[in-house]
Amino acid sequence: MGCAMSAEERAALARSKQIEKNLKEDGLQAAKDIKLLLLGAGESGKSTIVKQMKIIHESGFTAEDFKQYRPVVYSNTIQSLVAILRAMPNLGISFCNNERETDAKMVFDVIQRMEDTEPFSEELLAAMKRLWADSGVQECFGRSNEYQLNDSAKYFLDDLDRLGAKDYQPTEQDILRTRVKTTGIVEVHFSFKNLNFKLFDVGGQRSERKKWIHCFEDVTAIIFCVAMSEYDQVLHEDETTNRMQESLKLFDSICNNKWFTDTSIILFLNKKDLFEEKIKKSPLTICFPEYAGAQEYGEAAAYIQAQFEAKNKSTTKEIYCHMTCATDTNNIQFVFDAVTDVIIANNLRGCGLY
């Protein structure tokens, strides 16, 4: 006797196959929509990563962007010099030449008049160059871990002639080096490897953290940024707390959060270039008194990585770690390519498609 299906059964089977097909398509679509959350303490390089995504995966900066960053470069440069000048008496450092007092007054006056976003006058530019060349100012700069100073200070102050030119226009690297405190949430959309990325950058300072909470839903992966070079520095918001210890505490709370049980965690140990320079002269024991290794990049970097990985209490969750230099476009392009491959594999696995 035959097993012919009734019209109803055929329709039910067709519906079932269509539902299966739809579910698979939905799964594939879900695997294509990637939501990334950039986390990390203040000044760990998150905003620079966002800028790099614009360069690498969008069309880069617009003419309007270049124009808007010009006053930011002026301000970052003069504010960095002022931070050094203000730190000098606190550290008991004097100018090599007393005439620099007059130059310093000119710089302070510009800040007081809130003209730090204006192009440098010839007199101001000359004063800034004399100050930056002063051995007392250089000595104070060499102790910048003892006060708050932008990472980009040397980059800009070493290039005062270019920045002070009448026809100065910021370069891509200038924009990457600028520092503007992130408040609220910055969102960037781009496509890469047939995936649709939404990248969220949230303010890293303590006062901003409460705003992260509603970004957490449906996150595919977290990129957690740590400034490796800040092992001997304290927080802006609390000058008794070591910056790297704060990052470790924050990483612990994110990595082991019940909301992120199934979320890939990617650790960017950032500012490797600054760390490589600093580790030669500033001991890692400032942050990790128990460290007994060499004061050299490879061993010290591996130790820092191990400290972060040790915070992971899960036996199933893997931490994907990369040493990065957020201002180096080639480095970030290479790292993000590797990160994307991990996300694709994990995401397809999560959808039962891998």
UniProtKB/Swiss-Prot annotation:
Q: Where is this region: G4 motif?
A: 266-273
Q: Which UniProt keywords apply?
A: GTP-binding, Lipoprotein, Magnesium, Metal-binding, Myristate, Nucleotide-binding, Palmitate, Transducer
Segments carrying the region annotation (G1 motif) are 35-48
Q: Which residues bind GTP?
A: 40-47, 176-182, 201-205, 270-273, 326
Question: What are the G-alpha domain coordinates in residue numbering?
Answer: 32-354
Chain intervals for the UniProt region annotation (G2 motif): 174-182
The segment annotated G5 motif runs over 324-329
The residues the record assigns to binding Mg(2+) are: S47, T182
Instruction: Provide the family line.
Output: Belongs to the G-alpha family. G(i/o/t/z) subfamily.
Task: Tell me, in a sentence or two, what this protein's role is.
Answer: Guanine nucleotide-binding proteins (G proteins) are involved as modulators or transducers in various transmembrane signaling systems. The G(o) protein function is not clear.
PANTHER family, from UniProt? G PROTEIN ALPHA O SUBUNIT (PTHR10218:SF362), GTP-BINDING PROTEIN ALPHA SUBUNIT (PTHR10218)
Task: Describe the protein's quaternary organization and the partners it interacts with.
Answer: G proteins are composed of 3 units; alpha, beta and gamma. The alpha chain contains the guanine nucleotide binding site.
- State what protein this is by name: Guanine nucleotide-binding protein G(o) subunit alpha
Q: What is this organism's lineage?
A: Eukaryota, Metazoa, Ecdysozoa, Arthropoda, Hexapoda
